[in-house]
Amino acid sequence: MNLLLLVAGIVALESSLMYVYLHKKTHISLSYLYKDNLIVILIVGAIGYLLQNLIDEWTVVVAICLVPVVGLLLTMVRFFRFPLRKPVRNEDAIVSPADGNIIYIKKIEKGDVPMSTKEGVTATLHEFANVELPYPCWIIGINMTPFDVHRNATPIAGKIIMNKHFDGKFLSLKNPNAIAQNERNTIVIDNGVHQVGVVQTASKLVKRIVTYKQAGEQVEQCEWFGMIKFGSQVDVIIPCDYEIAVELKQQVYTRKTILATLKK
């Protein structure tokens, strides 16, 4: 019994510290201290209980090693999951194409090329130079943590008039050239009245952006169009005919959160 209490205490402390560290490094919600943290503690605790008679004094060591392993497996489940959410479909609204938190909301004036920013570093999205975006417009940056769904959905219904992929290089998003040189994919959707752009940017050691759609295809609002495997960022280009409905640091959810609504 004393051994089990020791294991439980060590596992709880290690798991809690792990999620606090992840919160500091990746800005995940503190709610995971009560969700995934508890699940990790219960799973590792149960394994330790079942194995205590087989490994005896090694129970503590095994439990310590299992915490990050179980935590990683749980994160992968969250990462690749298809969320069971009823999609929000509103022809007068722009729905978030990604899970994550809002890191900036900037206005783009006529004649300017959209700029994407990550950790204070700004890069020009040159692919928009030849696209007739309805200026002025907004650009909203969404940072996706390892705990967010990394599948992306269309913010509006319409026709994909641009779908450009850039292979990029293996650079950390902390690198000043990351946004310009890391792999990214850009689509622009035209609903006959407005055009909305979505830019998917990969993180270091990733280069794994998967796109399910092609230029010329018609898409429904909240339809899955791609995925960024592992760390990433999504930028949304929105016409100023829309009123922004989110704020900085807000957590948003793909197919669920309304980013902007058409002005009356």
Question: What are these model-derived regions, one by one?
Answer:
Residues M1-K264:
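Contiguous, well-folded functional domains in the mature portion of proteins
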